[in-house]
Amino acid sequence: LVGSEMCIRDRIWNSQVWINGTKVEGFNESLTTPHYFNLSKYLVPGENNKIVIRIDNRRQHDISVKNLAHAYTNDTQTMWNGILGKIALTAKDKVQIEELRLTPDIDNQTVNVSVKIGSNGSSPVSGKLLFAVKDPKGNKLADKEVQVNNTEITFTYPINNPMLWDEFTPNIYEATATLETEGMTDSKCEIFGMRKLTNQNALLQINNRRLFLRGTLECCIFPLKGYPPMDEAGWEKVFSAARDYGMNHLRFHS
């Protein structure tokens, strides 16, 4: 077991973890993003390991006026107890792709690629990264190979004559980054759309055309459970209903 990572999603405020009675270094404190813990130094391979998680949803910081912060009130169904969503324990190689970030540039017909590599070892990371893209029709574009000698890699990938994304033609590209280093292989896949969001004289533009926002506020609308969906199917229902009513965006308090 070279590396292990725990991901805790959909919990409120402060989390800490113990493995076999030993506290894992650090703690996570956020209201909206997943909490991650590196357990590599604490788990014993081949043995039963006891994992204890403590969630503290008490007010950690005063972020509101008259208790009206929408990220932490009973009025918006955001003061949850414990963990509502996903808990995952993932075994990882010593070297792996931590983040693949894609930023489209339709003016130059490119996508700017940023790759962050994580390593549990002390030696420098070296190897190669293979970057591949499929267009919205499923056609494979030219591969790009990049030499790896650092934990952060940035490069530009050409998207000639891109099929642009908007709400009426939601063209989606699929990118895959594959890291080969030290006899190990790791891959990460992300989707992206070629689009540009700007403003012109305080008017929103998408791909140099006027954009009209038609949306609603989703807030405290789950009375049976008291919290938003914790699975993909639940969110598909929410977004599909909004789309069927002609909306193109949602705003959330919960």
Enumerate the language-model features and the residues they cover.
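Conserved, mostly hydrophobic/aromatic
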Residues: 87, 173, 208
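Beta-strand-rich binding/interaction modules
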Residues: 110-147, 153-155
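Conserved aromatic beta-strand anchor motif in extracellular beta-sandwich/beta-rich domains
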Residues: 17-21, 129-135, 179
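Accessory beta-strand-rich segments of carbohydrate-active enzymes
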Residues: 4-5, 9-96, 120, 249-253
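Surface beta-strand/loop "capping" patches
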Residues: 91-122
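Short strand-edge motifs at loop-to-beta-strand transitions and within beta-strands
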Residues: 33-37, 151-157
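Active-site-adjacent substrate/metal-binding segments within catalytic domains
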Residues: 4-5, 13-18, 25-29, 62, ...
